């Protein structure tokens, strides 16, 4: 399959989506941040001096989805219909799993917006808690699902 972001001279270009059909597009991405028990408990018990960590991560994730095209060079700026973020507490592993669902009616998908949302949400958690645990790890950032568009639906293998 040829790369669509290169022109005839092998130089970068933004793909022309003008002739594509506007359809509903949805993307769901996820990722995890793991930390020590002290950091996990501080988040759960609202004991982080910088403020409410999980709520701040949700806001950061929403903001990131809206700014994706400003940071990813070939990503088209698109109007988002909604960004919904859910953070699951995983007490046994002292980790949090963040899910971002992004929805639009557009000529291109929102996979990058969902992935950006997850990444920035997790980085925000890291930033707010690094004073307690600098060894936190972010892992498994991935596209779980996408629907709409010419390529159809995608579901990650479990």
From Swiss-Prot:
CDD domains attached to this UniProt entry: MoaC_PE (cd01420)
GO molecular function, one term: cyclic pyranopterin monophosphate synthase activity
E.C. number: 4.6.1.17
Gene Ontology biological process: Mo-molybdopterin cofactor biosynthetic process
A Pfam family assignment: MoaC
Gene3D superfamilies associated with the record: Molybdopterin cofactor biosynthesis C (MoaC) domain (3.30.70.640)
Keywords recorded for this protein, A-Z: Lyase, Molybdenum cofactor biosynthesis
Residues the entry annotates as binding substrate: 74-76, 112-113
UniProt key word ATP-binding: no
Domain of life where this protein originates: Bacteria
Active site: 127
Pathway(s) per entry: Cofactor biosynthesis; molybdopterin biosynthesis
Reaction catalyzed: (8S)-3',8-cyclo-7,8-dihydroguanosine 5'-triphosphate = cyclic pyranopterin phosphate + diphosphate
First-level EC class: lyase
InterPro entries: MoaC, MoaC_bact/euk, MoaC_sf, MoCo_biosynth_MoaA/MoaC, Mopterin_CF_biosynth-C_dom
Family the UniProt entry places it in: Belongs to the MoaC family.
Quaternary structure (record): Homohexamer; trimer of dimers.
Functional description taken from the UniProt entry: Catalyzes the conversion of (8S)-3',8-cyclo-7,8-dihydroguanosine 5'-triphosphate to cyclic pyranopterin monophosphate (cPMP).
Protein name, UniProt field: Cyclic pyranopterin monophosphate synthase
């Amino acid at each position: 399959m040829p790369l669509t972001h290169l022109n005839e001279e092998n130089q970068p270009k933004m793909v022309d989506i003008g002739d594509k059909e506007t359809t509903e597009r949805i993307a769901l991405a996820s990722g995890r941040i793991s930390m020590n028990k002290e950091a996990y408990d501080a988040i759960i018990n609202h004991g982080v001096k910088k403020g409410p960590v999980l709520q701040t991560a949700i806001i950061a994730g929403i903001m990131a989805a809206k700014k994706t095209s400003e940071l990813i060079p070939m990503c088209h700026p698109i109007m988002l219909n909604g960004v919904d973020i859910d953070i699951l507490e995983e007490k046994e592993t002292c980790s949090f799993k963040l899910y971002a669902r992004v929805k639009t009616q557009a000529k291109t998908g929102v996979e990058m917006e969902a992935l950006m949302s997850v990444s920035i949400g997790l980085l925000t958690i890291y930033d707010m808690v690094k004073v307690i645990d600098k060894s936190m790890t972010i892992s498994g950032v991935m596209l779980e699902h996408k629907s709409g568009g010419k390529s159809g639906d995608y579901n990650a293998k479990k």
